[in-house]
Structure formats: C-alpha cells, structure tokens
Regions:
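Short aromatic-glycine motifs in intrinsically disordered, low-complexity regions
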Residues: 1-9
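Short, compositionally biased strand/turn segments
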Residues: 1-2, 40-41, 87
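Phosphoinositide-dependent membrane-docking surfaces
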Residues: 12-21
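Short acidic, Gly/Pro-enriched loop/turn segments at secondary-structure junctions
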Residues: 22-32
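Acidic surface patches and DE-rich sequence motifs
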Residues: 23, 35-37, 78
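Broad gene-expression machinery/nucleic-acid interaction feature
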Residues: 28-30, 64, 81
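Acidic, aromatic-enriched beta-alpha/helix-loop junctions
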Residues: 35-74
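Polar/charged, Gly/Pro-rich intrinsically disordered segments
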Residues: 70-89
Length: 89
C-alpha cells in the first residue's frame, strides 16, 4: 500500500478478494474488500453508491475531472435511506 500526504492508495494487486452481499437479516448491501496483508474493509451500501455516483460523473463527462462529496446528516430523507449521506458539494 502506498501513501501520499497521509492518504492510502490501494493498488489493484493489493486487493485479493471482494464480496458484495446483503447479510441475513439486513436490507442493504455490504461490500468487503480483502487485502493481501490479511485485513479487510467493509463498506456500507450508501458509501458504495456515492463512489459509483462520483465514478460515473467523472467517467461519462467530457469536462468533469473531479467530484467532491462531503458527509452530512440528513434530517429529511427517503424511507430506508441512511441519516448520514455523502453528497456532492
């Protein structure tokens, strides 16, 4: 794993496995990355959705090269949505 200014960058070869599933008794997707050093990182559906939105915005736009999202607590939200959301600035 490389670092730059306190940021961790995972190289593709450092991710040895990925499991995306809706655990028993839950309603939302969880995605677990397994790393070469044996550690794992589990992301909730709302985090993956934010990553997908940002990725899609950058990859499909001829002019957008960056998307910035910040976490916010949402007092009003759709049923089933998390109170904490990553939203575009």
């Amino acid at each position: 794993m490389t670092t730059a200014d306190n940021a961790r960058i995972l190289r593709a070869e450092e991710v040895t496995g990925l499991v995306a599933e809706i655990p028993e008794g839950h309603r939302h997707l969880r995605t677990t990355l397994t790393l070469a050093d044996g550690t794992s990182l589990t992301l909730q559906e709302s985090t993956i959705a934010a990553i997908v939105r940002a990725y899609t915005a950058v990859k499909t736009s001829p002019v957008t090269t960056r998307v910035v999202m910040r976490g916010r607590r949402m007092a009003e939200r759709k049923p089933g949505y998390a109170e904490w959301q990553l939203l575009e600035e």
